[in-house]
Amino acid sequence: MRLRNCLFATASVFAFGLLLSPASVTAQPAPPALVLAVGGEPETGFDPITGWGSYGNPLFQSTLLKLDTDLNLVGDLATGWTLSADRKTWTLTLREDARLPDGTVLTAEDAAFTYNTARDAGGVVDLTNLHEARATGPYTLEIELKEPEITFTSRLASLGIVPKAAYGPDYARKPIGSGPFQLVEWREGEQLVVEPNPHWYGTKPGFSRVSFVFGSEDAAVSLARTGAAQLVAVPSSLVDETPQGMKSLHVKTVDNRGVMFPMVPDTGAKTGEGYPIGNSVTSDKAIRVALNEALDRQALVDLALSGHGRPAYGPADGLPWDNADANVKGGDSEAARATLAAGGWRDSNGDGVLEKDGRDAAFTLLYPASDSTRQALTLGVVEQAKTIGIRITPQGKSWTEIRTMMHANAVLFGFGSHSPAEMVRLNGSRYAGAGYYNPGYYNNPAVDAAFAKAEAAESFEASLPFWQAAQWDGATGFGSKGDAAWAWLVNLEHSYWVSDCLDTGRQQIQPHGHGFPITRNLEEWRWTCQ
């Protein structure tokens, strides 16, 4: 799901600073409103059916299951759940005390409505394998799949349940659910204000109001430095410059950044919307493999993240379904040059750029212009690629522009999930051209077959060899030893400035930044100063 970091004009920052000046924030032990600047304003609003909360924590809604701090699967709305012997039907018992802010009870009928509506919407939430969800009682639910799907638990733990009676065209702008918070106001591009749901069944929030301020990174930093915000997400390059009265917080993540390559040549094909498909340079395997061989990822960590991160070699480094043998480790320019030479790339005119069949080894790399970390990574890749004769032109664009260009140009994307299902969405042929998933139109039947075997496995543990085979089975795979569909670069640490008085509790290993991951346990946060 694409989320935007809207620009917040200097004048708006100043005006907001007057409302939440250091004097007003520090005049009492706890601020009247907890102010957070964590980015990630959802362009499409707060509707789980269109993708809100797909990386967890829908804030306003409850999910059937959830992942606890240690990433164990536990109940949220569900108090019990079983899977049938044929692994196609989930039966769940729901809690009876889940209520909307107006006191309306949330029932199994609402849950069934949510799943069936998301299936029919055919959007970001992939429920194509769902046959039917049905309420078998006020608080009992059956979810029947067409085929076994071992990763369906990730849907159970991420899809927020919407109330059937309150759901309509304006729901995304006026969300309501049985989650810990309710919407008070959303001024798009500026701020979101929430208050506790008085009927929330979990830990009672420690703050009567929370304001999320949206804006540029510079604006967020200014809010922290003037004392107008109590928690701010900051780029790794700034995190060590902690303002007085705040502390730095580094959270481990599976949030990665990498270069997606268009995998088919330019034949003039276009999407149904008229956007071009294909790139005749990046579709050459030698180009993709050579870049993976050449890139010094630790240098990129040091350059773009000030050392606050680790190299990335695949989409799931260190997770149980990762295949560490699927990828080259990089930093080997000689191997990269040999790969290019074997692929027929030569510098015939001495300009430092390789050619093949009259075409330069040159392409454009897009990145979101509002993201300084992705810009730094892009520029680092550009410089390293020069050393092996590949010319990359960096272009910072809006997400709206990237959407129209991403099937024909390389893009510096970010992903990272607690589920191996994301590997399918990034590399499965059935997702080719499906929004931001597989925009490069990658298609490898052996990879698809491995994914199918993983999903049909009898247990999660039994699925692991198949996830790993999709990356590299000794002959092929989407990893850099195989088709090199991506050049993964870095795994981030999520970095924050946090008020010395704010206790945010234990944090999960966080997924990709979309969906306010730091706020997963927002209801547990407490003000510690007296």
What annotation goes with each model-predicted range?
Residues 195-198, 255-287, 303, 492-493:
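A bilobed periplasmic-binding-protein/Venus flytrap-type ligand-binding module shared by bacterial periplasmic
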Residues 35-85, 116, 176:
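N-terminal lobe/hinge region of extracytoplasmic solute-binding protein
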Residues 29, 85, 93, 123-166, ...:
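Surface-exposed binding/hinge segments that line
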Residues 38-55, 77-79, 104, 152-160, ...:
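A structural "hinge/loop" feature
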Residues 79-122, 142, 223, 280-283:
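Aromatic- and charge-enriched surface segment that lines or borders ligand/interaction sites
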Residues 28-29, 187-191, 196, 256, ...:
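Detector for C-terminal structural segments
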Residues 154-209, 218-219, 226, 333-338, ...:
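Gly/Pro-rich hinge or "lid" segments in bacterial periplasmic/extracellular proteins
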Residues 197-244, 391-393:
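Ligand-site clamp/hinge motif
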